[in-house]
């Protein structure tokens, strides 16, 4: 097969567009421009499923970072409906002028013009402040509806820690407790300190430092607490994690620290003193304060250092470690460079306080799916990056995985023709894709821990199942509200939608029967549900009556359905703010049903 020059071929085509190109030349051109090698087609077919978990993670990462940014920007934003009459600078200037004017006044009472000017400035500032508060309240309400889970508004929280804790094994739970629950460990030490002191002995407690008790408990008992967690029944730990309110847990973790728990520990053991094992040469703070002989020029600095145990421990640690002096000096000279590094955990705490509802992910994902082609075209025209989140795959062959020789032969036969990494996939099982050389080890590892994969895939499948139901319920409630406010749809609207909106993304989410019953109930969701149930009962009765001979079970089902239908018809007359109670009264040895209504607590 003769080689050809692409530039020459392109030149000939541009000069004479009618030039015919042979099939062989087109094949060579395709092979030169296509980076993926092709193999001979096979008559066998492999069925497979694939889900892009990497893209799902990136979407969640983007959503999380976006939420943190929006809430932070809201805190720092000062809305401006119009240019403010008084800024801080102009207000200060005017107040200085007023003070000078008051000094020049000869009378004790300031002039009426001065008083009116002050009141005008105060009213202007008050108005601007009130507008700012109202704007922030409105925006905060909007953000919380979309980005903060509320069980009264949303179906499910995006926070999955509880379910993860329930499924995680003992070792994972122990390591998690060890790394994230320092404050909990400290508080646990506080509650058990009395028994520890008792077992240690009164004489030991008397000679031990109170202030160092807390830090010792907080610093030395984390591992003990972790091992205790590891020995604790997993189901109990899981149920506790699942039952604990997530937001409360997050705020507690964010607000509580080891030092706070340390002080609690110190207060609990007020009658005892502990030795700081990490710094045994340091004089206890309360003893040092009794024997201080401080020169006058150092009194202010010493008072500031010894005001809290934390400040005293920090100063003592720096003095005892000469190698820190130069670094501390650099830090004090350039605090802006060190603060973001040493206090970056505050960002994580702030982000963890705003947990979005799962509904937001569903709405966002639905918008992307419904406008996917348009979004791709817009993205490619705006940004230089190409879509790299999609995957293409090719099946080369199917061999017996038990025959390792055939697997190796295939690899060595085509290794020079395949530019990309080769992965082995076992049919009938989910497999995480990896390079051929390391795939066997990774495959064995994930099969030994296949519960990890199962949880990820089960979670993804569960999200897809309930996503449509959440969207359908949202549309159902919005449609009911629309009917209450504006009435039913115009008669020709259904014909228009069927003609022009055949590709609408929400088509089919609400059935014709549901829309009809919503209009029949004037947007009252409670009555619309009753109408749906009545239609189902009537359809079921119609099907049973259409049969010539009913079985005993079908006759019982018919009687039961008729009773349910009658009860549903009666429920239509029950007001929304009341509860119906059926009562049976003995009337001349005959039971008669009476209906009682009681007001519902809304």
Swiss-Prot record:
Residue windows of the Sequence repeats: 161-164, 165-168, 169-172, 173-176, 177-180, 181-184, 185-188, 189-192, 193-196, 197-200, 201-204, 205-208, 209-212, 213-216, 217-220, 221-224, 225-228, 229-232, 233-236, 237-240, 241-244, 245-248, 249-252, 253-256, 257-260, 261-264, 265-268, 269-272
GO cellular component: a single term: host cell cytoplasm
Intracellular or extracellular location(s): Host cytoplasm
Ranges for region 28 X 4 AA tandem repeats of [CNG]-[AV]-[DNS]-[MT]: 161-272
Record carries keyword Repeat: yes
Keywords for the protein's UniProt record, in alphabetical order: Host cytoplasm, Late protein, Repeat
Inducing or repressing factors: Expressed in the late phase of the viral replicative cycle.
Residues of the signal peptide: none
The protein's role, per its UniProt record: Plays an essential role in the assembly of the icosahedral capsid of the virus. Allows the assembly of 3 molecules of hexon protein p72 and formation of a thermostable trimer.
Protein family membership: Belongs to the asfivirus B602L family.
Protein name (Swiss-Prot/TrEMBL): Protein B602L
Organism: African swine fever virus (strain Badajoz 1971 Vero-adapted) (Ba71V)
């Amino acid at each position: 097969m003769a080689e050809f020059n692409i530039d020459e071929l392109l030149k000939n085509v541009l000069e004479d567009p009618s030039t015919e190109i042979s099939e062989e030349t087109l094949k060579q051109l395709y092979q030169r421009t296509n980076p993926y090698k092709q193999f001979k087609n096979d008559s066998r077919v492999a069925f497979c499923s694939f889900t892009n978990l990497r893209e799902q993670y990136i979407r969640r990462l983007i959503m999380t970072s976006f939420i943190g940014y929006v809430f932070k920007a809201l805190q720092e934003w000062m809305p401006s409906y119009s240019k403010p009459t008084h800024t801080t600078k102009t207000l200060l200037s005017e107040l200085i002028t007023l003070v000078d004017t008051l000094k020049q006044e000869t009378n004790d009472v300031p002039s009426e013009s001065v008083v009116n000017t002050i009141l005008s400035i105060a009213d202007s500032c008050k108005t601007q402040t009130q507008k700012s508060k109202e704007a922030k309240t409105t925006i905060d309400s909007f953000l919380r509806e979309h980005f903060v889970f509320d069980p009264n508004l949303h179906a499910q929280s995006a926070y999955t820690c509880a379910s993860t804790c329930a499924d995680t094994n003992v070792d994972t739970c122990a390591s998690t407790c060890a790394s994230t629950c320092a404050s909990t460990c400290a508080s646990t030490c506080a509650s058990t300190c009395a028994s520890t002191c008792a077992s240690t002995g009164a004489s030991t407690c008397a000679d031990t430092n109170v202030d160092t008790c807390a830090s010792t408990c907080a610093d030395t008992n984390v591992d003990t607490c972790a091992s205790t967690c590891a020995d604790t029944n997993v189901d109990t730990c899981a149920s506790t994690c699942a039952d604990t309110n997530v937001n409360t847990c997050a705020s507690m973790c964010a607000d509580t620290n080891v030092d706070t728990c340390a002080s609690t520990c110190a207060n609990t053991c007020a009658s005892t003193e502990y030795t700081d094992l990490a710094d045994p040469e340091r004089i206890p703070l309360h003893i040092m304060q009794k024997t201080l002989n401080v020169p006058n020029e150092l009194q202010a600095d010493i008072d500031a250092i010894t005001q809290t145990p934390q400040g005293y421990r920090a100063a003592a640690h720096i003095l005892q470690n000469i190698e820190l002096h130069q670094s501390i000096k650099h830090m004090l000279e350039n605090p802006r460079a060190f603060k973001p590094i040493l206090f970056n955990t505050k960002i994580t705490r702030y982000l963890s306080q705003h947990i979005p509802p799962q509904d937001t992910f569903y709405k966002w994902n639905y918008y992307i799916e419904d406008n996917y082609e348009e979004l791709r075209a817009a993205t490619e025209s705006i940004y230089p990056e190409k879509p790299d989140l999609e995957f293409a795959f090719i099946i080369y062959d199917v061999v017996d995985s038990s025959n390792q020789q055939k697997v190796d032969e295939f690899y060595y036969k085509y290794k020079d023709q395949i530019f990309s990494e080769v992965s082995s996939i076992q049919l009938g099982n989910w497999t995480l894709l990896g390079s051929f050389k390391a795939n066997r080890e990774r495959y064995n590892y994930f099969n030994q821990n296949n519960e990890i994969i199962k949880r990820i895939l089960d979670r993804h499948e569960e999200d897809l199942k309930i996503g449509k139901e959440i969207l359908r319920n949202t549309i159902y409630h919005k449609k009911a509200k629309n009917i209450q406010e504006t009435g039913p749809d115009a008669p020709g609207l259904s014909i228009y939608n069927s003609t022009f909106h055949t590709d609408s993304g929400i088509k089919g989410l609400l059935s014709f029967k549901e829309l009809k019953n919503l209009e029949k109930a004037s947007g009252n969701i409670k009555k619309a549900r009753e109408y749906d149930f009545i239609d189902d009962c009537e359809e079921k009765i119609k099907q049973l009556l259409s049969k010539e001979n009913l079985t005993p079970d079908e006759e019982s089902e018919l009687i039961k359905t008729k009773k349910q239908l009658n009860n549903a018809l009666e429920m239509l007359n029950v007001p929304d703010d009341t509860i119906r109670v059926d009562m049976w009264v003995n009337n001349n040895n005959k039971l008669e049903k009476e209906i009682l209504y009681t007001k519902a607590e809304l």
